[in-house]
């Protein structure tokens, strides 16, 4: 029997789905994953591009590793629910976030937008494909929950940008050392997009085998903030002017919100 825990031991938590994302709960992710059959879970992974090349045209691009359902062990589904048991490239991971930012439609990435000849005529890059992966409503709900990650109660408050709504997710993964075939060190990451309510850019930060502090939010968040701040300013992307209405992250906050809403409706 395999017992799963969150990375940091804690008292029992009663989290909402947004709370599971905000605090990066492994056990919460497992419980959400259990709502899906293995085939459905695998189908969503493949639709998001896991296990296949992105179509970017980058030379040497890897497909990553996604085992077939028939090859899963008893622990595959739970570990895959929180991001272990398969591998993907930074381009693949960023493409997943771009799909959520793009209202659930996955568009194959391209290294260049196109070419312009001596006369100034622009020719778009060929071969881009698109596929709906999730509904626009689901994508919007995901974006709202991912804003909680960047809140003061999430794992990446250091990714917040003053005046802008930011959404994202941290990653702190055990790192495979090919020399021993064992886990050694960590891969810290943060991928996010802004403005969260009208996404314009997605930025991915990955730090391999950091020494000392190894949390994705603490390491990747500040880098994301600097890069995204520059991009938004240099591309003249103005703040949307809207504010983020915090989503309850746990049972107590959810009950309080329901009581507040009931009072407002009376």
Q: Which ranges hold each PLM region?
A:
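Short alpha-helix boundary/capping segments
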Residues: 134, 183, 212-223
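Low-complexity, flexible helical/coil segments
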Residues: 25, 56-58, 69, 230, ...
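Short amphipathic alpha-helical signal-transduction/dimerization elements
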Residues: 101, 150, 225-232, 236
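Small/polar-residue-rich segments within soluble enzyme cores
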Residues: 205, 222-225
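Conserved catalytic/cofactor-binding microenvironments
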Residues: 235-259
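Beta-lactam-recognizing serine transpeptidase/beta-lactamase-like catalytic domain environment
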Residues: 1-207, 251, 255-266
